[in-house]
Regions:
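Charged catalytic and DNA/RNA-contacting regions of genome-maintenance
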Residues: 1-234, 240, 244-257
Length: 257
């Protein structure tokens, strides 16, 4: 997973995710831990069946980690998640996902003795995925991201991803609506995102992508966003002045991260 800002797409989050299936069956639950490597954002969520595929598709990871199997073949559900995300799979040792080992990895990463301060429980299945992801990042990322003792100094504490605040768009709908990429070429050019993308900062470009992939469902939040847009429509001089002020602003999220 790339971390050099000069090689990254400034309009997309640079996400690596770890998935762990916690139940058997096609509609079984699975947990995911994901990190935006260049900014340090670190979140966990749980979903089942089609919902998980939809979440993975919207998240758009560049790499998906999973628990290695004895025969070296990824389980069918993991393969479906790979297809939804359109990213490569990486098998990781079983022990990195084991609850006790994963808890120890998380505690050591943040130099704490309990997860209570993060609002997490040591029995939370998502900690297994979180520990495996941290271990992988420690092994693969640049020493420049470390704290000098094997820890990732830029990685924020994990938190539960808030679910239910946006419209669920399944992977097939994301493709057919051509929200982010066209069906014919698989490229951004020609998609809805490319038509609307007029943001002048890298942070704005990623935010617009997020808004399109995670449409609001709360009426008050929708109206609040519309009111801001209306204010700029009524005052084009203000809009132009703001664009001038923002033009040239560097990717602060990745610089700070």
């Amino acid at each position: 997973t790339l971390i050099d800002d000069t090689l990254l797409d400034e309009g997309r989050p640079n996400v690596v995710a770890a998935v762990m299936i916690t139940e058997s069956g096609d509609d079984s639950a699975a947990v995911v831990a994901w990190a935006e490597v260049s900014t340090g954002r670190f979140e966990l969520f749980e979903a089942g069946g089609a919902d998980m595929a939809a979440e993975i598709a919207r998240l758009g990871p560049s790499e998906l980690l999973y628990v290695e199997t004895a025969d070296g073949v990824a389980p069918p559900r993991v393969e479906r998640l790979k297809e939804a995300a359109g990213c490569p799979l990486t098998a990781r040792p079983v022990w990195t996902f084991r609850q006790r080992d994963a808890v120890d990895t998380v505690l050591e990463q943040y130099g704490v003795t309990t997860l209570d301060g993060f609002g997490l429980d040591e029995d939370d299945p998502a900690i297994g995925a979180a520990g495996a992801l941290i271990r992988y990042l420690q092994e693969t990322q640049s020493p420049g991201l470390g704290a000098g003792d094997g820890r990732l100094g830029h990685l924020r504490p994990p938190k539960r991803q808030a679910c239910g605040g946006s419209l669920m768009i399944d992977a097939a709908s994301l493709r057919s609506l051509e929200i982010e990429r066209t069906m014919r070429t698989g490229q951004v050019e020609g998609s809805l995102l490319s038509v609307l993308q007029r943001c002048v900062t890298p942070m704005g470009k990623r935010l617009l992508r997020h808004w399109l992939c995670y449409p609001l469902v709360d009426r008050q939040a929708i109206e609040a966003r519309q009111n801001v847009v209306a204010a700029f429509v009524r005052d084009p001089d203000l809009a132009r002045d703001l664009c001038r002020q923002l033009d040239g602003v560097q990717d602060l999220a990745r610089i700070v991260g």
